[in-house]
Structure formats: structure tokens, C-alpha cells
Amino acid sequence: MDFQKAGLRSHEYEIILRELGREPNETELRIFGVMWSEHCSYKSSRPLLKLFPKEGERVLKGVGENAGVVDAGNGWGLAFKVESHNHPSAVEPYQGAATGVGGIIRDILAMGARPIASLDGLFFGNPDSAKTCRLSNGIVKGVGGYGNCVGVPTIGGKTLYDERYEDNPLLNAFCIGLVASGSIVSSQTAEPGNWVVLLGSKTGRDGIGGAAFASVELGEDTKASRPQVQIGDPFVEKLLIEACLEALENGLVTTMQDMGAAGITSSASEIAAKSGVGMILDLDRVPLREEDMVAWEIALSESQERMLLIVRPENLEAVLALGKKWDLDCAVIGETIEGNRFILRKGGEVFADLPASLIGGGCPEISWPAERPRDLDQRQSFDFPTTGFSEDLSRPLLSLIASPSLKEKAWITRQYDSMVQVNTVQGPGAPVSILRIKENGNLVAISMEALPWICSLDPYRGGYETMARSLRPLWVSGAKHLGMTNCLNFPSPENPEQFWEFSEAVKGLADCCRDLSCPVVSGNVSLYNETAGRSIPPTPLVCSVGIIEASCSPLLPGNWKKGDFLFLVGMENASIPGSHFQKFFLKHLSGRPLPPSPQMEADFMERAVMTAAKKLADSAIPLLGGGLAIALGKESIASGIGARISLEFPTHPVAVFFAEGGARALYAVPARNVPEFTRTWKGFPIRQIGLVGGDALCLPQSDPIPLQILANAWKGA
């Protein structure tokens, strides 16, 4: 095998030759090919990721670990991360999605945390195509099948349809776990003289080369890539979770690492490199599922449900007994040593002898050229076509609320168990998912957001708005944000225009995080999401996590009461470009989204959190996809009561009711609280726009929409 077949570039191979002082053998070459792949090394994105603010007063563990951990109060921490499993889900939808869920759960487990909830970002192509139907059904079944069996509730997510995801659907899996602050596990604490223990499933040939496969664009014939997709077993994962947590509770493990991409090689070399130790692994000791596996296959297999433990000699017998108790394979496969050597042996022969730091962190960065797209000015030129749209808003509202990306997703959520562990306060379908932390009485609020249409028109403003829009649901619920994690889904960085979009989106995310003091504690980058030149739109996905103190109650949507006054807070000059209305009705994207307004966001945050803490409103919802009209529609449906809206139009009514962007929310306030509510929002744009009551939603200059008709449209009945 030559270096190019291993996936290495010529300058990378030259570095390897220089550092080793010799040519690598086949096993070593394969190791470098996988460990220096885009998927494992982040060589194209590392320079940009340095822009993210990573420090925060409540950050306990940040970027560089298996997941970030933030302080949840009273001696408890929340470990969380989002990660992609895009290529595998496109090739083998069920297993690709299932193992994506399993992998992110183990990342949380590796921090010493018990996984308590997951969310999933799903991006599909044309909903009417047979291909999308096959892929979406398989992916959703995979998410539900694994999460339900392993006992981790799926409490929310994001689903969006766009024809550009037809060949490259995206699955971004998020998981959050709970850990005692003094029991957080680090991947950087291994010491020489400890045993290396493999716990979990046997090792087979599934998933070999998966990391390298995820680092190139998909071919049109996906069948050939199926062997590179891993096979999951959630029942083994459940046992693995309990075994690992018991080992940690008893102080038997010093370091722990999930075996994901690149398998044993990745987990072992990363621990060695981060901890400053060497490692000798005996591949003959690895429990195998298949016969005649050669050294590099064992070293790079991505078989699921496996963890690598670093164990002090005095704790080894107890760890082996624990494996037996939980009916898991548990084997000593090596030891940690002084120095920087990473050595693989099999049958008495040394198959790899490499510097651990070179494998786990020595891949050089790539500085791709970035060019502003030549057609961007044309894309951003936009005049809203007021002709052709009636001022009657009932028809566009009924059509838009029934559109694929905005309609009810019961066909998805009914396949998920959202209540297992019985801590769910607000589950799928709401702007924010909320969990109860029984250990300290606090509530954790989680939101997931992605805005590919806005990012397509202005990636910087799109990145900024994505971050801000992920935070607003937390604030409206009453939560104070603790941190964020992101998954950066983009096409090939080798295209200068695409890399420019990637760079600008990251800058937008980073600036928003900095402006609003939201640290980035973990994340993932997924590049090369394209097939035969057909690329996905720029899709940075963000998950933000916040906390509601035990003394406060969350402010939830769907609780309108008869006689409540409806208030719109926030800017009226929102944006049609990149909106659901533009995508669904105008069938194309054009124009330039709103510029960021950091002070408006900060003012909104302060007042929204205060409104919830004072219990001034019966119901509240941030204005997200579809704008004011969709917020009114969803609140009417969820509350089972109508409203009469009175609002003057400085522009065409469509531009008022369906525009998106900016710090805006809809509040339902009982009459007794109106004076205090208006005082709380003094100095911020606020308008009373209507009154709750009746059995229809009555918009200005429009036919009343009976609630049953509105609900039927949303549910697709």
C-alpha cells in the first residue's frame, strides 16, 4: 500500500518520513491514514475552531475532552456534546443512525456521567421522493430503536427538509449526562505502569475504515461503502453503561475513552498523547468476533459498544470481576509505559512502533484558500414581491404550517421514548426541551437550532443568528445559559467558495458566543458532505444548554388562558430572506438577512429571564421558523383556544407575520400582570397585539381560521 491509497497527502507523508526516519510499514501507514483523516484530525478546521471562546465561570471541562462539562449547581455537572454520523446514515440508514446515537452516549459516559437525554438533528431531501422516504424512515427508526432500548430518552431535536440533502442526509446526535463534580473523568490522567483494559463487545470487521470514509465525499454507489458502517447493539450498551459507572463509583478506573472512529488505535493513542505516556498493546489479547483478523484490522476496527479503561494494578481483579458480573468481555490488552512510544504487537511481532504524540496530535493543519462566492451579490439582491399575495393571511398560514419542515413531526416523535428515566418536563415538539435534575432540584433546558437557508445567503449573519436563535428559547423559558456545543456540517473545504462559507459561519458563531458570554465546551466538524458535485447548504447546528434554579418554574408555551393579552416583544423589522415563507412560497432563496444586534440580544435575555422568574406570563414562545404567524398558530393549537389579533402594518402584512430573525417572542399575559410586564420590558420594543379567546384564530384583514382546521393542517390530517 502506498501513502495515497492510505488517504495521505504528499506533504503529510514527508512529515511522517522525517519524524520516523524510515518508511512506515503497512499497519503504520494505515494508522496514519485514519488518524490523520479529516474526521479524526480536524486538520482543515482547527485554525477556525481556535476562534471559539472556551472559558466560562461554570465550565468544569472544556474542549479537548470527550465532552464538555458545566456546573449544574450543588456539586453536580452536566456533560454534553453533539456529533455527526452523516455518511454512515446515508449509506445504511438504520445502523448509521443507531450507532451515531450509541457513539455520542459513550462520549458522555467517558466523562463519568450517566446519560440522561438525547436530541437529534435530522436533515432530509425532497419529502416526496422515494429516496428521502427510505432514508428518513431508516434513520428515524435507528434513532428510536437504539435510544429506546438503551434507556436514554429522546426529548427533542430539529427536522428540516431541503432538496440539497437528497444525497447527503444529516444526522447530528446530541447527548447530555449527569456527573458529580468531583467524579469527572479526564482522558488526560493516565500514568505509566497501569493496565489497559478493553471492556464491552468483541471486535469484528465492521466499520473498518469508517473514519477515512467519513473524510471524503460520498460516491453515487453507496452499496460499496456498507462494510464501513458499524453495527450497534443497544442492549450491550446498556450493560456497558452500568459496568462503567459502577467501576467509576468504586474508584477502579483512572481514565476512560470511548472506542469510536479508528477504534483501539484512536482511543489508546489519544489517551497516551494527552497524558504524556507511552503504550504497548498486545492485539492477541483482544476478544475477537471473527477469525483470522490481521493486526491492522484489529487496531482500526470500529466495532461498537467498547470502552478502553486505564486501571491501576491493585484494581485490576475488581475490574475483571465487574466485566464478568455484567456479562461483558473484559480483557487486559496492554500497559502504559514511560515515554512516547505507541507499540502494537501480535504473535510476538511488532506491527507498529510510533510516537504517540505524532499519531494523536501530529497531523499538520491545512490552510485552504477562501474566496467569496461570485454569485453572492446576486443571491443577496432581493425585493419582496408584494404583488401576487393577498392581504388575507389565513391561506398562507394554513399552507405554511402544513409544510414539511414546520408541520407536526408525530411520525418521528412517536417512535421515541421521551419519558424513560421519568425526568422529562417538556419533550419533543417544543422550542426548548426541559429535564428535572432530581439530585439538586434544578431544571436543565436544551435547545437545538440550524438555519441553512439563512447561512446560504450570508454565512456570517447566518452563523450569528443560529447561535442567538438557539439561546432565545432558553431565556424565554427562564433558563440562564451555561454553554453550547456545535456540529459544523459543510461540503468539501477544497472548494474555495465553500471554505469561505465555512469560515464565515464559524466567525459568526464565535462572535455571537463572545458577545453573549456563551462558552463553547465541545463540538464536531463534518466536512465533505457532497455527492458527485451536489453539496449540502452550509449547516452549522448548535445545541445550547441552560439551567433554571430550583426556586423557579419554567415558562412554557401552549398555556393561553381566555382573556390573556398577547404581547409581541422585539423588533418588527424582521427578515424575509432565508425564511420558511421564502423557501416554501417563493421557491428560491435571495436577499440578505438582518445584521446582528448584540445589545438587543443582551437586553432581550435580561428581560425574558426576569419575566419567567416573576411569573408574569401564562405562556411564551420565541419567534422561530415561520415567524409571528406560525407562533400564533402553534400556540392556538397547543392551548386549544383562539385569539383575535389587531396589528397595523408598516409594510405588507406577509412581511410582518412571516418574517424571521432577531430577538422576538410572543407572550400571553393575564390582565393583572400587564402593568408589571410592561415595566419589565420598558426600553425594549413591545406591542400589545391581541386578546386570547374564542374557537378561531382571527388575523387582521383575514378570514377567521377555526382551531380544528388549523390543527388539521398542522397535523397533516
Regions found by a protein language model. Give the residues of each.
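Catalytic nucleotidyltransferase
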Residues: 233, 593-599
